[in-house]
């Protein structure tokens, strides 16, 4: 073999590929990414001031004041956020408006690279400042996908399909690599977690009942026979650990079969549970398995495009750094931490939430606990604050609203699962350690903060000021079709205990 062939081939890997047959897949993936960003900022438009605003649950101004007092110039690197410029309601609203505007431009295929940068920076600015309300794996997935998509996207203001700027094989590989890692690392994490339900295939027995925000389809799926749940548990492991390797094959049949199987898995999850944009995003990475020739219509051919040496080198460095950093977390999926010499590139990217570790559904929850808030004007009669999305009313069917993400209600589910296996007498003590922000919710409700009240469906006191607010813990079960016909109820529940200390007005 000619020695020059290796660097030549490596160079062609990073160059825009004039023979690319994935113009349509790239176009669709970028439009989908715009939709996901729009859903994020749209949901934040309704929640952000209640979550981290000046009168919210965890004001970002408190975080920035704390960091400013204790850190030097490194604070801008450790917490990269535009909110350093204005850590207040005005800055939060500006962030959301910019995100909405540029995500809409990305959907419309206007200046896709610029739109991706602005969407990514605005989203990172929120994630870095939101503490408990941005601690999900989906955050890292979206930021990873946005960073990879920047290298995949065509240049120009109105590039159309981007035939004049075809994607490089390296950029396409980076997106597929993220999708592969999400699947494979999640499969490894399931086996490495020590949860016996994945090994004995009982993990899905109560999955639909105990997940964060189920749908009405999930309610019916829970009623299916035990054999179905065993099959889906085994199929999930097989797909995540074996089938997903098909993303690296170029043969048409392997690509399309892999795409079909992965898509069916994600559609099943989307139909039965509301995981915001998470599964939509994972599904969208699979678009890049479908070539233009696989479509029933013809698309324009890619043309030769040669970038400047500076752009080519910058692209190669960015792709190489992201890939190398992700190798650290991929190679040690299921381990506590990657070894240091591999972990350094990932540690540099960590403040930017890039090259993340994934491990979806590594441990399954065995019970469903729910927290709800009650208020009283006299300390005797209490009324309940109704939620917008999560299970509460026993006769209300679970809804479908993903990719919208109700972060407040989502976080309450995570607080509640911390109580699994905790003796009743220790519930409040554990809650103070794991979710102290719940007390802040009580305090804001005492103050009648309009932005925190807006996180609920309505005000049960109809404008009256509460003197007492408390959080109560319940255990929930799904009913069955016979009980539904007899009582009209989708849920039954049992009171467990007061979740955390009651807040009261001393005046």
Describe each region flagged by the PLM.
Residues 2-507:
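Alpha-helical membrane-anchoring segments
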